[in-house]
A protein has these predicted regions:
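Structural preference for beta-strand elements that scaffold enzyme active sites
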Residues: 5, 13-17, 60-61, 87-91, ...
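Structural motif
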Residues: 53, 57, 115-116, 176, ...
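Structured C-terminal cap/extension of enzyme domains
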Residues: 55, 60, 79, 197-387
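Alpha-helix-loop-beta-strand connector modules within alpha/beta enzyme cores
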Residues: 74-92, 144-152, 204
Length: 387
């Protein structure tokens, strides 16, 4: 297993991290939303076996959060790492959307420490920051809270996860002495949200960068379109789509570790085998060209020609325009698009949804693709809700 230093910290992290959002369920996964449903119990025996196998094979970074598996994920992880605490790095996140007053920061954090059966976490993140939530929680004293838990030892390091445009990302990076950040990054989303620009910016400021969705929630590895598979098959080297995707992420020296939300032992075994062969900058120019062709082929399937540049942002009404258009495109590009429906209907804040568009037209004035965004947002809401 390859290990890399996480930013300015003293932590050496495995290049493969274990994301605990998609653990196996007792009765199987019927819908994408099951991973947030407290009535869908985790299959503890299988999940703990997977985590123990990962630890035994060198994985040391484990990521969870308050809402994962309807609040069960942190407890399961705490149980799984009992007796292994000195071998692992635990990261969890503050449910900032549930914070209504300053005392809530401590209340939720203490509850999370109890679930994790630990007196401290290695990394505590503000979960899912965007422009609106960032300014709101700052006013509630989030940064003073982070200072406090670092000083009293309940959190060794602090960071944030992020879902918004790159200028907001840079603002947040420069606003506090963060140890690390967590961003979405894969070969299809190279310029989406924080993207490559944000990745390099954070690393240049000394932050460790952890990548989520390196396989885009499994969409880059399952249900591969025939025209994409043909490109993979044309390569001089035989690799699974998962290996291509992970190697692409690891080809960026700014990345410390890539999280994979694994739900079966087979996935754990496969990803660990890939990670054991990992090295920094592992792709040749010819291999990068193969990935570029795959990306181009996927993009030709786009229904809305949005590049994710975010020139349309910020929306004065709070709509996350690039995210809405991306979710809409996902429903056409990938065979399994249920995650797009789940995110729109269950994860986006009301103001972020396409339905919150006031049709002011300000976004269209700034769109370099000259998209009819107001009309597109109507189609987005109709397709993702059936209304």
């Amino acid at each position: 297993m390859l290990y890399q230093k996480l930013g300015r910290t003293d932590c050496e992290v495995s290049v493969l991290g274990f994301g605990c959002m998609r653990l196996p369920l007792q009765h199987g996964l019927e819908r994408a939303t099951d991973i947030f449903d407290p009535t869908k119990p985790i299959n503890e025996e299988q999940a703990i076996a997977m985590i123990h196998y990962a630890i035994g094979n060198g994985v040391n970074y484990f990521d969870t959060a308050y809402p994962y598996h309807g609040g069960q994920s942190e407890s399961l992880l705490g149980k799984a790492v009992s007796g292994y605490r000195n071998k692992v790095l635990l990261a969890t996140k503050s449910p900032i959307w549930m914070i209504e007053e300053t005392t809530d920061f401590d209340r939720f954090f203490d509850e999370q420490l109890g679930k994790l059966n630990s007196s401290y976490v290695d990394f505590y993140l503000l979960h899912g920051l965007n422009r609106q939530s960032w300014h709101r929680i700052k006013e509630l004293g989030a940064l003073d809270f982070l200072d406090k838990i670092r000083a009293d030892g309940r959190a060794r390091h602090v960071g944030f996860s992020f879902h918004d445009e790159v200028e907001t990302f840079k603002e947040i990076v420069d606003s506090y002495d963060w140890a690390m950040c967590l961003i979405q990054y894969n070969y299809f989303d190279e310029h989406y949200q924080a993207g490559k620009e944000g990745l390099q910016y954070a690393a240049s400021r000394g932050l460790g960068v952890v990548v989520m969705e390196p396989l885009r929630g499994g969409k880059l590895t399952e249900g591969i379109p025939a025209q994409v598979q043909a490109i993979w098959d044309s390569a001089d080297v035989s690799r699974t789509p998962a290996e291509w995707a992970l190697r692409w992420v690891w080809n960026h020296p700014e990345v410390s570790t890539a999280l994979s939300g694994m739900s079966t032992m087979a996935q754990v075994e496969q990803n660990i085998q890939i990670a054991k062969n990992a090295r920094v900058n592992p792709l040749t120019p010819g291999e990068l060209e193969i990935i570029a062709r795959v990306t181009s082929t996927y993009r030709q399937m786009l229904k809305i020609d949005c590049t994710g540049c975010a020139y349309c942002m910020p929306c004065p009404n709070g709509v996350d325009i690039p995210l809405n258009l991306s979710l809409y495109n996902d429903t056409f590009m990938f065979k399994d698009s249920e995650i797009a429906y789940m995110l729109y209907n269950h994860m986006l804040a009301p103001e972020q949804k396409a339905s919150n568009c006031a049709e002011c037209g300000e976004c269209e004035e700034h769109c370099p693709q000259h998209l009819e965004i107001r009309e597109e947002l109507k189609r987005v809401h109709e397709r993702l809700t059936g209304e």
